Curated annotation (Swiss-Prot):
Keywords: Pigment, Sensory transduction, Vision. It holds the Pfam family Beta-prop_HPS5. One of its GO terms (biological process) is visual perception. Belongs to the HPS5 family. The gene is p. One of its GO terms (molecular function) is pigment binding. It comes from Aedes aegypti (Yellowfever mosquito). This is BLOC-2 complex member HPS5 homolog.
Length: 845
């Protein structure tokens, strides 16, 4: 039952009506209505449809002041964790910030707009439908110096207050951090991790390393939130079996160091204790670890047995926003009910259904504030009964009490350094050393830490390598804080040339920038643009979208030469972030943006860059396919063309440009690397009526569309005779003519002879009409077929001869007469009887 759960968690509920108090400033007007609110330790702040903020004292609910603004109807209000800043927004994409709520001076709302960073190379947030985005979620960063804003179009932007606090501000600039495909529902933060929940997915972001990961693979569609749960030792500190066992074993011991008991707030939280909870349809929650791996699914649809007497047990409640309560529980609500759930135990702790029409619910400490659509306000207080828990005492080993590092950091450091890690029992884990260092620096032994390092340096016949304190602490700030405690005797800081970490750790690669920590004024204009390019790229991976319009907004401000320079810088950034195939990814970004018409207008160097990128991109991605093709023994050109080609319109335009200027060397350089482009050159041969080249190219390329075009435009009976000669040479001599040097080359692998392969296919499969296109099923992404028939069917006697009759190039009797000269060379059964009927009737199907 619910009350049993309340007693189990040590909770008791109190309710206070606040409607009269909050309505006091509005008693003389009916026009002004409150639209949203937030609470902090000191204040209750309401946003109104007039654009003003109404500030109340939280304890007494006394009205304090009005903060006016030009925002119009306010839709979002969020107070920072220190209670000194306020973030507000409206439905038109405007954002306001109040910097010093506790100051004595008159308060001012500083305004900016979503997409305000566009002028500096930022990424705008006007949606694909053309509507203006608006803020749907706020999240204050660490130390309340950063404000993350999620909007209705899927953009998460960062506003860095540290850039302008204490200055005269003319404007504020938002920097895009993450681009997703739809509405942001909720944003939460834990250290450098940012958790973003949209209508369809949850994304975990490391803002320092710029890494992104989607949590789970199953999509959803609706307003579903997500949050971090960080265990709070001040609440629900129930003893484990191991705790009780250790406590019992130490009862009556004279070695109990009760004076060393640390406060709960000083207890460290292990990373593996932090959990992520993501809402799912059907009153479910996904539980994931700190790395974004889904561990289990919690079902709450049938958990509340107390609801059977009051409402339908099977009713599904959508968990829209997840709000943390007392460090472990989660509060969710809809427009009629409030639920307090324990996500770890999959249990409903509290259910409230008599609070009216709910608009917003906010939490601070043990107080739950409920604001109704009818302008009512109430406070629900959850009193926590603190339970005395037996302290986990140190165990005895061989009759002697061990010294845990949380209680005796000096011993751990002295033992580790002066024994140089050679004795048994030495604690060598990274967490142990960090905890010990922190314990020493915080405690009264900080002034003696110098002697420990001196003792460590003097041990052993050889001087051991020096401990690098800054690397153990993993940040310059932590190192500086520690150095302030140490003595200033410079003689003790002489270091050996060989310095290493005592604790091996994985340091992230050096980066050009960090999205969450870097200020815009520290970057050049090009670096800002590169930053935004990389951001769009990372967001496109998470969202599975192209974002071509985003790239266009950035690239349109630069000429081609500048874009090439930006791409080189972007490649460096990707390499530093351990992106695989960074060169190819940069090429893809540019080619997705490039309009082929520009190839005719740009300078020579830029055109050469595009040509080289086209060759590199296709050779890398089509490596296996190109390796399957035979090459000329003399000149090294491919004897046949490949089927796939990435960005064929770019390659085709390059061939057209060079051919129009009779720069044939560049054309043949392209086809030597990417033989697919012989399609385009063959078209020029047909167009120019180059009989000496056209027939040979048509045969080697094997494109039905080219054969049908040539049959209509230039083929005579003599041309069909030449084509039959090429067919017999290929079939009987296992040879193909090189399109570059005209040398007859024998195929090293008979299995790659297109006519032999087609003959085997015909023997293994039923005969199909070669003009029937419905049997073709091409599932290979990137394949470009230049005709209406599968390319393999091209190399068959039936297809070639039927094309001659169907295109009405020659009459049937002339074709039969031509074939009489080849009857002893053509395999038996290679030509179907339907072809002979066509010739006799001189009609086509």
């Amino acid at each position: 039952m619910i009350m049993d759960a309340l007693r189990h968690y040590g909770l008791s509920q109190q309710r206070t009506e606040l409607t009269s108090a909050i309505q006091l400033p509005l008693r003389n007007t009916r026009r002004i209505k409150f639209t949203c609110f937030d609470v902090s330790e000191k204040y209750i702040i309401f946003g109104a449809n007039s654009g003003s903020l109404y500030v109340y004292d939280r304890e007494s609910v006394n009205f304090l002041s009005i903060i006016p603004s030009q925002l119009g109807t306010i839709s979002q209000v969020q107070i920072s964790s220190n209670g000194k800043q306020i973030a507000v927004a409206n439905m038109r994409g405007a954002i306001g910030v109040v910097l010093d709520l506790d100051g004595s001076a008159s308060k001012e709302v500083l305004l900016t707009e979503l997409g305000g960073g566009e002028a500096a190379g930022g990424v705008g947030v006007v949606g694909r439908s053309g509507t203006t985005a608006f803020v749907t979620s706020f999240c204050w960063g660490e130390d309340d110096k950063e404000l993350y804003c999620g909007d209705s179009k899927g953009t998460v932007s960062l506003l860095q207050l540290s850039m302008f606090m204490g200055r005269n501000i003319l404007n504020m600039t938002l920097s895009p951090v993450l681009l997703l495909e739809n509405h942001i529902v909720q944003i939460d933060r834990y250290k450098e991790l940012l958790l973003v929940s949209t209508l369809s997915k949850c994304v975990l972001c490391n803002t320092q390393r710029e890494e992104f990961k989607q949590i789970g693979n199953r999509p959803r569609d609706g307003l579903y939130g997500a949050t971090f749960i960080v265990p709070n030792p001040e609440y629900f500190n129930t003893p484990t079996e191991e705790d009780l066992e250790d406590a019992k074993s130490m009862e009556g011991s004279d070695d109990n160091d009760n004076d060393q008991r640390s406060s709960p707030s000083g207890v460290k939280i292990a990373q593996d204790q932090v959990r992520i909870f993501c809402s799912r349809p059907g009153s479910r929650l996904w539980e994931a670890d700190i790395d974004g791996n889904v561990l289990r699914t919690h079902q709450f649809r049938h958990r509340s047995t107390d609801r059977e007497a009051n409402g339908p047990c099977n009713e599904i409640i959508a968990f829209k926003l997840l709000q943390k309560v007392l460090g472990r529980l989660i509060l969710v609500h809809d427009d009629r009910e409030i639920f307090l759930i324990d996500p770890i135990a999959s249990q409903v702790v509290l259910w409230i259904n008599n609070v009216g029409d709910i608009s917003r619910v906010r939490l601070v400490g043990e107080d739950i504030y409920v604001f109704g659509n009818d302008q009512t306000m109430m406070k629900l207080r959850l009193d926590v009964e603190q339970k005395e828990v037996p302290k986990r005492l140190p165990k005895k080993i061989n009759g002697k009490k061990s010294s845990p590092f949380k209680e005796n950091g000096v011993y751990i450091l002295d033992h580790l350094f002066n024994n140089n890690g050679l004795k048994e029992g030495t604690l060598q884990t990274e967490s142990t050393i960090k905890e010990a260092l922190a314990s020493v620096v915080r405690g009264k032994y900080g002034r003696n830490i110098k002697q420990m390092f001196l003792g460590y340096d003097q041990m052993g016949p050889e001087r051991p390598k020096t401990l690098n304190i800054s690397k153990v602490y993993n940040s310059e700030e932590s190192y500086n804080n520690m150095v302030q405690v140490l003595p200033t005797d410079e003689s003790s800081y002489a270091e050996d040339d060989c310095s290493e970490d005592v604790v091996p750790k994985r340091n992230p690669p050096k980066k050009m920038f960090s999205m969450s920590l870097l200020s815009d004024y520290q970057l050049s204009e090009d670096d800002k643009t590169v930053r935004n390019l990389y951001l769009v790229y990372r967001s496109s991976i998470i969202s599975n979208l192209n974002f071509a319009d985003r790239y266009a907004k950035i690239f349109d401000a630069y000429d081609t030469e500048s874009i090439v320079s930006l791409l080189h810088k972007l490649e460096i950034v990707m390499d530093e972030n351990n992106e695989e195939q960074s060169r190819l990814k940069c090429i893809k970004i540019y080619f997705d943006y490039l309009k082929v018409e520009l190839i005719w207008e740009i300078d020579v160097e830029s055109r050469a860059f595009i040509k080289q990128c086209f060759i590199e991109y296709n050779k890398m991605l089509l490596h296996e396919e190109l390796c399957e093709l035979e090459k000329c023994e003399s000149c090294g050109h491919y004897l046949r063309t490949n089927i796939n080609c990435h960005y064929p319109e770019i390659g085709t335009t390059l061939i057209q440009y060079y051919w129009s200027r009779k720069d044939y060397a560049h054309c043949f350089e392209l086809v030597q690397q990417i033989p697919f482009l012989w399609h385009t050159i063959t078209k020029f041969y047909i167009q120019d009526n180059r009989e000496d080249k056209a027939i040979q190219c048509i045969w080697n390329v094997g494109d039905p569309g080219l054969l049908e075009r040539a049959a209509c435009e230039m083929f005579t009976m003599d041309h069909w005779r030449q084509l039959l000669d090429l067919m017999l040479t290929c079939y009987n001599s296992n040879s193909l003519m090189c399109l570059n040097c005209d040398k007859l080359c024998t195929l090293a692998d008979p299995g790659r002879n297109p006519m032999w392969r087609e003959q085997q296919n015909q023997a293994q499969s039923p005969v199909v009409n070669p003009k029937d296109n419905n049997h073709i099923n091409n599932n290979n992404i990137g394949i470009t077929t230049r005709g209406s028939t599968n390319v393999n069917r091209f190399y068959s006697w039936n297809y070639i001869l039927n094309t001659a009759i169907d295109q009405k190039c020659v009459d049937g009797k002339s074709m039969l007469k031509l074939l009489r000269g080849y009857d002893e060379y053509i395999p038996k059964g290679a030509i179907s009887t339907s072809f002979y009927l066509k010739c006799l009737l001189n009609v086509s199907d």
